[in-house]
Amino acid sequence: KAVDMKPSVREKMILQSKCSIRDGYYDASAAYIRKAVDDILARLHTDYLDILLLHRPDALMDPGETAEALERLHEQGKVRYFGVSNYSVMQMELLQKYMKQPLFVNQLQISLAHTPLIDEGMAVNMDIDQSVLRTGGLLPYCQFKEINVQAWSPYQKGFFGGSFIGDLEEYGELNSLIDTLASKY
C-alpha cells in the first residue's frame, strides 16, 4: 500500500488504469470491464478512477455493449473519463458512436526517438517512406476531436529498440540535452 487514500489525499491525484486485455486475448465485454474496474478500485483502495482506458482494441467487441458498460460506470461514479490505447480513427469513431461522453485520451507509442505519428503529417505529398499514411491521420484526428494523446513508452526508440536513455552512441546529443535540462530543473 503506497498511499493512504484519505479523501484529502485522493483529491490531489489523477488515477488512471486500463482494462480489456487478458491472457491470450482482448476482452471489451461489459462483464469483463465491470469486474476489472471493481478489482482495480479494490486494489487501489479508492471509490473511483479519474481515467479508464481500454487497452488495445478488441476487434470482436460489440461497441454498443462496451459503450453501455462505460456509461454505466460513469453514472455509478466509478470512472470520470474514458479513453483508449492504440485505437485507430475508425475504432474510436465506432466506439464513440455509442457513447454519450467524448473519449478523453488515446494512449499511443510516441517518443523523441519514435515519431511516426508526427512524421506522416510532415511528409505529406513527398515521395518518401514517412509520407505513407499508416495511421489514417490519427494525430490530426485526435487534435480535431480534442482527444488527448498520451505517450506510452516515452523513452523507447521503437517497440523492440529499447530505451534511448543512456544510448550515447546513437543518441548522445539527446542524452546530453536531457542531462542538462534535468540538472537545471
Q: Language model features by range: what are they?
A:
Residues 1-14, 75, 157-158:
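N-terminal binding-site loop/beta-alpha segment at the start of enzyme catalytic domains
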Residues 19-34, 55, 60-61, 127:
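Active-site mouth loops of central-metabolism enzymes
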Residues 3-4, 38, 93, 179:
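Active-site phosphate/pyrophosphate- and oxyanion-stabilizing loops and adjacent acidic/basic residues
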Residues 41-62:
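Active-site groove signature of glycoside hydrolases
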Residues 10-23, 107-112:
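A short, structured active-site edge motif that brings together acidic residues
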Residues 26-45, 65, 89-94, 134:
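Short, acidic/polar
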Residues 57, 61-185:
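Beta/alpha (TIM)-barrel catalytic core signal, keyed to glycine-rich beta->alpha loops juxtaposed to Asp/Glu
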Residues 9-13, 47-51, 80-81, 102-105:
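Short acidic capping loops at alpha-helix termini that bridge into adjacent secondary structure
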